[in-house]
Amino acid sequence: MPQTIVVKIGTSSLTDPKTGMLALATIGTLVETLTRLKQKGHRVILVSSGAVGVGCGVLKRSERPKKIAEKQAIAAVGQGRLIRLYDDLFTSLQQAIAQVLLTRRDLVDRTSYLTVQEALNAMLDLSVIPIVNENDTVAVDELKFGDNDTLSALVASLVNADWLVLLTDVDRLYSADPRQNPDARPIPLVSSSELFNLQVDAGSSGSQWGTGGMQTKLTAARIATSAGVRTVITQGKTPQNLLKIVAGEDIGTHFEAQPQADNARKRWIAYGLVPQGILTLDDGATQALLKNGRSLLAAGIVAVEGEFTINDPVELRTQTGQAIARGLVNYNHQDIEKIQGQHSTQIRQILGYGSADTVIHRDNLALLIAAEGI
């Protein structure tokens, strides 16, 4: 049965860890494997990191750039070299590809979010393999994905993928970093209920040339599985294992998809938007949201952070700082500060108007964790 498969390969798998030069054997095997998946009738998207790392190799830089403008320039050099290589290799196998460079801004606006979705699906319908990367040359810090793990999960959600496979520099998830802790235990399977409360010592920020790490992959798994996408973390140096994984073999760590995926609009609220502020909730409001699926009332808010206006996205947190949900507000930050802790019937009296009884209606609220996580 044809399936939609999103594959993300990280910089650590695409390049030599010492020199930053391209790992041509790995890339060649990846291209051949993705083409074979296409020949089997599957729809395939590749999310490829490596622009900055490859750019450093081209320019013979020994360290990743720290200045933003320099990084943007080097990314432009590397992206050109990387996509040329992909095009040459896929063309030799008579497989068409398309380059798709995205920024967070493309997903923040609902209209452009849907436009990206339609464009990706059109490419898949044309039997093209889209090759996606963040557009590092124009992305600004406040509107960056931060890493391609998050980007790949959002892409998988956009196209309602069956699989998201994260190719990385370890063969699976461990209870601790196996490169530093000899007692680290492999974790072959994580259920959807376990994932949101999973605590592992997952190391730090990834390779010298990349920005990802195991924590970002766990975040990606949470995003993808909430969209009904089965997610796998596995070794990037053996991309041929993709064929075995899709065929049902237990390779790497598998994260089970949620039995009931969140609807597309709530996924956009939860993960496509960038929160403009934070609302801290009391225990009663936290339980009402997580266990009863209620709207957020002013009475349950104990603190307001940030500056935002009506319909802006905000993050909802417990009093211990745990993020539990995101939503679109019915009032700006100044008005919420005035009505926090107050009964809904008092809103009109306090503000002089009352556009809504709720601060966030449940239709505009998306949970980030399961009720058992509190």
Curated annotation (Swiss-Prot):
GO biological process: one example: L-proline biosynthetic process
Annotated InterPro entries: AceGlu_kinase-like_sf (IPR036393), Asp/Glu/Uridylate_kinase (IPR001048), G5K_ProB (IPR041739), Glu/AcGlu_kinase (IPR001057), Glu_5kinase (IPR011529), Glu_5kinase/COase_Synthase (IPR005715), Glutamate_5-kinase_CS (IPR019797), PUA (IPR002478)
Predominant subcellular localization, coarse grouping: cytoplasm
Cellular component, GO annotation: cytosol
Boundaries of every PUA domain copy: 276-354
EC number in record: 2.7.2.11
Keywords, ordered alphabetically: Amino-acid biosynthesis, ATP-binding, Cytoplasm, Kinase, Nucleotide-binding, Proline biosynthesis, Transferase
Family matches, as Gene3D superfamilies: Acetylglutamate kinase-like, PUA domain
GO molecular function terms attached to this record: ATP binding; glutamate 5-kinase activity; RNA binding
Catalysis: reaction(s): L-glutamate + ATP = L-glutamyl 5-phosphate + ADP
Catalytic class of the enzyme: transferase
Binding site for ATP: K8, T168, D169, T211, G212, G213, M214, Q215, T216, K217
List of residues binding substrate: S49, D136, N148
Compartments it resides in: Cytoplasm
Pfam families xref list: AA_kinase (PF00696), PUA (PF01472)
Pathway(s) it belongs to: Amino-acid biosynthesis; L-proline biosynthesis; L-glutamate 5-semialdehyde from L-glutamate: step 1/2
NCBIfam families: proB (TIGR01027)
Family: Belongs to the glutamate 5-kinase family.
Role this protein plays: Catalyzes the transfer of a phosphate group to glutamate to form L-glutamate 5-phosphate.
This protein's name: Glutamate 5-kinase
Organism: Picosynechococcus sp. (strain ATCC 27264 / PCC 7002 / PR-6) (Agmenellum quadruplicatum)
